[in-house]
A protein has these predicted regions:
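Extracytoplasmic/periplasmic solute-binding protein
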Residues: 106, 139-182, 225
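Glycine-centered hinge/linker elements that transmit conformational signals in sensory
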Residues: 179-210, 252
Length: 384
């Protein structure tokens, strides 16, 4: 069988070793893994991947499209109910149910992630400051960092811009997409864009081009970036020796009064294409690689970021990752699950570009809301 994941040690590193271990007990099975870019992970049509690969690691907003195009096999038709119930019971936050749609489970949560805070403990100590828990404290840290010749940072490319926008909207009780035909109210949008603008003033213009990976690569190789309030977590950077400078993670800071609530859940799921000639064997591999024993051992040990709560609770896993999982658990358990209907991918990319442009150009927020609502309405027609 052929599988495809995405190009980062977190996304690809564990898969060849897990395939080799699975083959040791299934000598007639060989799984060859390939990788695609982070951008293609979110944007490349998953129906095209299904024509070429048996196993695909993908993003959960695709599940509505998957359901309508029938290019993947429902896991609930391949695995015993007890297996799926166990995985659901050991989900961190809404990771497992993010792959449910129209009465079926389209993928299993092989990886779990959500926007959280990251920081350099040595640089924070140099400033004599603590990890922020509120947005106001983030801004205070940003001003102190700038005065010391450093800065805070945050990836503000289109996909990350909409991630931050929806995270902060939900954090202040804005309930994105809860009202028919509306992304958020004008008042919520104004509050969120004001918070994002005040932060962007303390960041580098380069942040508009950064992804969570490129931002963390800068934080972990230079002494420029002290702290980032919101970006998808990568536990690799909090492991000794992964990069020259150790970075740590913490729960997201709150803009509202309800703590670390509303983070825009991400992570990845593993799915089986309809072209797979050995779906039962593929499902057995998927269930094993997403299960607690594999996730807290070989999967984590080869750079993965588990989606199973047994790994998140494991003392050894937390020790080796400087408590990445323990220190971000509250955020992921209270994460926001974005829409997943067929067509939402368009909102993610085009809407993200609208938010980024409004932020960068100090645009009119009420016009942004109108544009987002129009895009939302158009997207309900599905991916064309």
């Amino acid at each position: 069988m052929r599988g495809i994941s995405w190009d980062h040690p977190r996304g690809f590193g564990p898969l060849p070793p897990t395939a080799a271990q699975f083959a040791a007990t299934h000598p007639d099975v060989q799984i060859v893994w390939e990788k695609r870019s982070l951008h293609d992970f979110g944007a490349y049509p998953v129906d095209e991947l299904a024509r070429k690969y048996d196993l695909v690691v993908l993003d959960h907003p695709w599940v509505g499209f998957m359901s309508e195009t029938h290019c993947y096999l429902p896991m609930d038709e391949l695995l015993p109910r007890a297996v799926l119930e166990d995985l659901a019971a050991h989900s961190v936050g809404p990771s497992h149910r993010s792959y449910e749609w129209d009465g079926h489970q389209w993928a299993l949560a092989i990886d779990a992630a959500t926007p959280v805070a990251s920081y350099r403990p040595d640089l924070l100590a140099r400033l004599g400051m603590h990890v922020p828990t509120t947005w106001q404290q983030v801004l205070e840290l940003g001003r102190a960092a700038r005065a010391a010749g450093m800065r805070i940072g945050m990836p503000l490319g289109p996909v990350d811009a909409i991630s931050v926008f929806l995270t902060l909207a939900d954090n202040i009780g804005g309930q994105p997409f809860a009202t028919t035909g509306r992304v958020v109210s004008n008042d919520v949008a104004r509050s969120v864009m004001d918070a994002m603008r005040r932060l962007a003033e303390l960041c580098d213009p380069l942040d508009y081009t950064l992804t969570p990976i490129t931002l963390m690569d800068r934080m972990s190789t230079t002494d420029q970036i002290v702290y980032c309030p919101l970006a998808y977590g990568y536990n690799n950077y909090s492991r000794a020796g992964f990069r020259p400078k150790l970075c740590l993670y913490a729960d997201m800071p709150s803009l509202g009064n309800d703590g670390p609530k509303g983070s825009h859940i991400g992570g990845t799921g593993i799915a089986i294409s309809t072209k797979c000639q050995w779906p039962q064997v593929a499902a057995e591999y998927c269930a094993w690689v997403c299960g607690g024993e594999c996730q807290r051992t070989i999967y984590f040990d080869h750079g993965g970021q588990p989606g199973h709560s047994q790994a998140w609770d494991d003392p050894r896993v937390n020790q080796l990752s400087h408590d990445f999982f323990r220190n971000t658990r509250q955020t992921i358990e209270r994460a926001y699950l974005r829409p997943r209907y067929n067509g939402y991918i368009r909102v993610q990319y085009e809407g993200g570009a609208m938010i980024q442009k409004c932020l960068r150009d100090n645009g009119d927020v009420d016009q942004l809301v109108r544009d987002l609502n129009d895009l939302y309405q158009q997207s309900l027609g599905g991916n064309k």
